[in-house]
Amino acid sequence: MANSAQARKRARQAVAANAHNSSLRSRLRTAVKAVRKAIDAGDKAAAAEIYKQSQVVIDSIADKKIVHKNKAARHKSRLSAAIKAMAA
């Protein structure tokens, strides 16, 4: 239990930050799922368009350090490879 005023304030801030960061992580997962769904549907043009939109979300969340930049790069790389593999 936080006993000092500073500790109580930091506890409040941590709750708010956790809620905000959770919503951003959810946006990341939703963006990745949207691309995966388009890939599974077999529509390469739609998948490529959704991928472009999801890149913005992924990069934005990595810039805010919600996820590590390497994790963001890995997501983008794997999604891009999956889209390219659709033609083959």
Curated annotation (Swiss-Prot):
One Pfam assignment: Ribosomal_S20p
SUPFAM superfamilies per the UniProt record, alphabetical: Ribosomal protein S20 (SSF46992)
Gene3D superfamilies: Ribosomal protein S20 (1.20.58.110)
Keyword Ribonucleoprotein tagged: yes
Highest rank taxon of the organism: Bacteria
InterPro entries registered for this protein in UniProt: Ribosomal_bS20 (IPR002583), Ribosomal_bS20_sf (IPR036510)
One term of GO molecular function: structural constituent of ribosome
Keyword annotations of the record: Ribonucleoprotein, Ribosomal protein, RNA-binding, rRNA-binding
UniProt-listed GO biological process terms: translation
Renumbered residue ranges of the record's region Disordered: 1-23
Gene Ontology cellular component annotations, sorted alphabetically: cytosol; small ribosomal subunit
Family recorded in the similarity comment: Belongs to the bacterial ribosomal protein bS20 family.
Purpose: Binds directly to 16S ribosomal RNA.
Name under which the protein is recorded: Small ribosomal subunit protein bS20
Annotated source species: Cupriavidus metallidurans (strain ATCC 43123 / DSM 2839 / NBRC 102507 / CH34)
